[in-house]
Amino acid sequence: MTMDPHRRLRKAFFDAPTLPLSRHARYVLFSDCHRGRGNSNDNFLKNQHLYSAALQYYHRHGYTYIELGDGDELWENRSMGQIMDIHRDTFDLLARFYREKRLYLLYGNHDIIKMSSAKARQSFTPLFPRITFHSGLILKDMEHKKDIYLTHGHQTDLFNSTLWPVNRFLVRYLWGPLERRGFLDPTSAAKNNKKKRRTEEKLTEWAKENGCILITGHTHRPMIGTADAPYCNTGSCVHPYGITCIEIHHRCLTLVKWMVETKPDQILYVSREKLADTICIDDLKTYL
């Protein structure tokens, strides 16, 4: 029997690992990097230097890196090994976090094979021995007020969760080739605004019904929660002009964009910019 979206989301957090959320903890949440094979379909390629600069910043400042799924594009590409070869510098940076026990990777719909594929896991083994990929993760509030639930967010859609093999086939053999000719995939929440809004509404509703703060990726639309809507989205690393993420520090959330800017003397530099006011966890309502 097909589960409804709310049950699929609850299942994502069954036996999910927990991390402490204290005033001293620092987490940075990225999602939807879609690292590819370095070809014309590799949407991550144009932002790889921004991503590298951001990772170096967060490593230097003591953040724990959490990736909320779709880190690698494994619908359009079959080989995780090829992706790691092309983006070796990126994975070397991630491995630094892993060696210091500061890296956690979730899977989304586009890299869902990490859930069970021994071959995909094997590609990670040299740099990330005994790595585990999770469907969800919970930041447990040490002040016993409001926990933060992290997952990819594809669970609201039947074709991106239960029927993902069908959707992967369509992306690989239909929408992928058409995208190279300028057509957008109408089944994608990242490219279809109507589907994007429906997904966001379902995720917000789930967060309210379950009395938690929910942070996902999937739609590629960055957003920070409000007092009445305890749902946030990290955005993605495939925007044309930058990458976005959410920083968590002092039990507060900050939506950040990394981009290339120009100084008056025409020197290019990487900038880190807040996209919205920082909001603290105690400012977000929960409904239970």
Residue map of PLM features:
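Binuclear metal-dependent phosphoesterase catalytic core
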Residues: A229-L288
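Extended, basic/helix-rich recognition subdomains
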Residues: K194-C252
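Core catalytic region of metal-dependent phosphoesterases/phosphodiesterases
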Residues: T18-R26, F30, R35-D141
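Active-site-proximal loop/helix segment associated with metal-binding centers of metalloenzymes
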Residues: I148-E201
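Active-site glycine-centered loops adjacent to acidic/histidine catalytic or metal-binding residues
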Residues: D32, D70, G108, H152, ...
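Active-site-proximal beta-strand elements of phosphoester/diester hydrolases
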Residues: R26-H34, D147-H154, Y231-G235
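A short C-terminal boundary segment appended to hydrolase-like catalytic domains
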Residues: P186-E201, E205-I213, P264-L288
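Acidic, histidine-bearing metal-coordination/catalytic regions of metal-dependent phosphoesterases
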Residues: M1-R26
